[in-house]
């Protein structure tokens, strides 16, 4: 069958687990657009300053944007509830019919980032997707696609996040919003793509070892979020930093490596 690594032939020894066990932090991205006359101006706040745990495995982080981030409005539409790729678009159409004024207000881009509060809804649950390289439909080369893990699929809707957004919208008179792709295609969006070259015991279970060294190769390390094997359920920046620091602590200083090479050359 087709192997997405074959066209480059650059890494023939890399594990077949490459692209498998991709994590999204089990995430859903929502927003609330506050009314124009609100006293609270989120754009003047620190970008990420607070978060809450609605359950032991569900964490909501609140994000604000500066006054120059209005382009992000194009990612959002009216929030809809749970459903499928068939029912969620229908629910969106119903919401547009029931709330035409809110829909028209949501289309106004100017000032969106000054009044918007984003909700990053993250979970530490064991779910995943996979990256798959496939031949292009037209022309040569490959294209990257994603697919759900058949045993532990990634959620397309998180009820706690929707309830939190609805709560804030009701109390402020704002507009609860979800990502357009989620509302129209039942596909969630993540700000934290992780995994795909995860840590494992061997090449059959992962792409890198516990020191982030790629199985089958010498002096090739993976030191970013793609090595993370699980959903932390929170912003992963510090976890990625810690894993990278651990990997770097196993790399000998350049002087020691030079001495080792000279000794090896002398003994041979």
Question: What are the residue ranges of the model-derived segments?
Answer:
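Glycine-rich loop(s) and the adjacent beta-strand/alpha-helix scaffold that form part
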Residues: 1-47, 224, 239, 243, ...
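Short, surface-exposed linear patches
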Residues: 8-9, 44-46, 52-56, 86, ...
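Generic detection of long, well-ordered alpha-helical segments
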Residues: 12, 111, 151-162, 237, ...
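FAD cofactor-binding and catalytic pocket of flavoenzymes
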Residues: 15-143, 150, 193, 214-215, ...
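Short secondary-structure junctions and interdomain/linker hinges
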Residues: 25, 29, 128, 168-176, ...
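A glycine-rich phosphate-binding loop feature that marks nucleotide/adenosyl-phosphate handling sites
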Residues: 48-49, 179-189, 263-268
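A glycine-rich dinucleotide-binding beta-alpha-beta segment and adjacent secondary-structure elements
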Residues: 117-120, 143-230
